[in-house]
Amino acid sequence: MGKGNEDSDLHCSSIQCSTDQPPFQQISFTEKGSDEKKPFKEKGKTAFSHSSEKHIQRQGSEPNPNKENSEETKLKAGNSTAGSEPESSSYRENCRKRKMSSKDSCQDTAGNCPEKECSLSLNKKSRSSTAVHNSEIQETCDAHHRGHSRACTGHSKRHRSRALGVQTPSIRKSLVTSVRAMSEAVYQDLAQVWAQQIHSPLTCEQLTLLTRLRGPLCAQVQTLYSMATQAAYVFPAESWLVPATLPGPGESALDREAHPFPGQEITETVSGSDEAKL
């Protein structure tokens, strides 16, 4: 029995050394003899020590593939994380840039629309204002040209009328004749009133009123008549412009009771009572 156990222990130790497996725990067999336990323990210790030394040497000489694989995976993971971080940051920056560019484009489109409308409206207003200004300038030029042409035609007509001896316009003739007719009518009325005083004497009140009216009326008549005569004599003298009768210098037509107006004569003399009243 003892020899069989020893052979089995040696066989196990040889198997452990050949397979390079980790050392197993010490197996103790309880047998009757104490002498047989001691050589078994000593042999087991020596075999275990030899196998452990060999295993440690092999572990030191040969690299562990699992550790290398784990280190490689860690390095790859670190590299992947280090590469992914800048990639993710660049991706985020690109996204931000795209968002900012889209916002800017939207703002530009939203802001350019009213600017374009304003520019179009300003262009339209400027065009309309320039068109109006050009039309006004054209109108003024046309009016100036027309006035110049009319002035030229007027000068030419005047020269022609003077050269051919044509009569003056009808407006001047009617103006002069109307002024002369009015002055003569007022003069006739005053002469008739003064003549009626002889046949039917007037009262004191009527005479005072007549004397008050006589001064301004005579002055107006004289001015009108003188204006008519001046207008007649300023222009070239013609038959219709020459007045019929002119008052003498230094005397008025109303002061001459004997000759108040051409065609009218006062034959009756003033009585003494009337003279006293006057």
UniProtKB/Swiss-Prot annotation:
It is found in: Nucleus. GO terms for cellular component: nucleus. Its main location: nucleus. It comes from the Eukaryota. Residues 11-31, 78-92, 120-129 have a biased composition (Polar residues). Residues 1-129, 251-278 are annotated as: Disordered. Pfam families: FRG2. Keywords: Nucleus. Expression is undetectable in all tissues tested except for differentiating myoblasts of FSHD patients, which display low, yet distinct levels of expression, partly from FRG2, but predominantly originating from its homolog on chromosome 10. Residues 1-10, 32-56 have a biased composition (Basic and acidic residues). Belongs to the FRG2 family. This is Protein FRG2.
